[in-house]
């Protein structure tokens, strides 16, 4: 199959190696988001050797935040960390227009990549429907590399990762790979092998199974526990 994967997107993604912190969204004592915490948070991660963050994903409680809150948190990260920490913005939403709006905003504030989880409501009937959903979000993000966030444990639709990759390389010009959060080793191995043939990247997302991800060939991982990293000795 002829692919339409953008080589620039892949090169930017391949520059992200090692642990990527899926960052928490800070809240104050009254339960409001607190973007003012982000500079200290970013400095802690920099001092611990973390070179990239995944903002407003499941760890960041994105689906419990308003669109305005998600925009505000992402802006705090880009204003604080752009140029010193690479930023992947999660823009997924069950409301496709909201996801598209967040993708446009992510592009405007200069993130390094965009990602979205599969919808958990109004599920796609087949792989093509699912990839068309992601293609619309990716198009709103214009030239930003795009990662599909596979996390079937959240109850969303799930198809074999290799099938998603095969469709995405021909339907999403900026497609750069997957954030794979599953405990299925066979699916992971197939996805890694296929990603390599297309010059893509699989980011392993199940922290507790990191060793199996490394054994399967992943060279980078996105997870909440990497944000707890101690300062290197």
Explain the meaning of each model-derived region:
Residues 138-145, 152-233:
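Catalytic alpha/beta core domains of metabolic enzymes, predominantly
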């Amino acid at each position: 199959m002829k692919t339409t994967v953008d080589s620039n997107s892949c090169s930017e993604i391949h520059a992200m190696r090692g642990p990527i912190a899926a960052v928490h969204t800070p809240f104050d004592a009254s339960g409001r988001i607190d973007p003012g915490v982000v500079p200290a948070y970013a400095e802690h991660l920099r001092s611990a050797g973390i070179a990239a963050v995944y903002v407003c994903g499941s760890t960041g409680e994105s689906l419990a935040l308003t669109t305005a809150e998600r925009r505000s948190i992402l802006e705090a990260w880009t204003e604080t960390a752009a140029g010193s920490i690479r930023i992947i913005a999660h823009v997924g939403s069950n409301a496709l227009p909201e996801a598209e709006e967040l993708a446009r905003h992510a592009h405007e504030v200069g993130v390094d990549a965009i990602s979205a989880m599969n919808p958990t409501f109004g599920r796609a009937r087949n792989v093509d429907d699912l990839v068309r959903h992601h293609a619309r979000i990716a198009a709103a993000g214009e030239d930003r590399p795009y990662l599909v966030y596979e996390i079937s444990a959240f109850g969303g639709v799930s198809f074999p990762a290799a099938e998603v990759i095969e469709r995405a390389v021909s339907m999403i010009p900026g497609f750069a790979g997957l954030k794979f959060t599953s405990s299925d080793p066979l699916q992971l191995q197939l996805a890694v092998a296929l990603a390599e043939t297309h010059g893509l990247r699989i980011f392993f997302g199940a922290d507790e199974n990191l060793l199996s991800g490394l054994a399967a060939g992943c060279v980078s991982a996105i997870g909440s526990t990497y944000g707890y990293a101690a300062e290197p000795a």
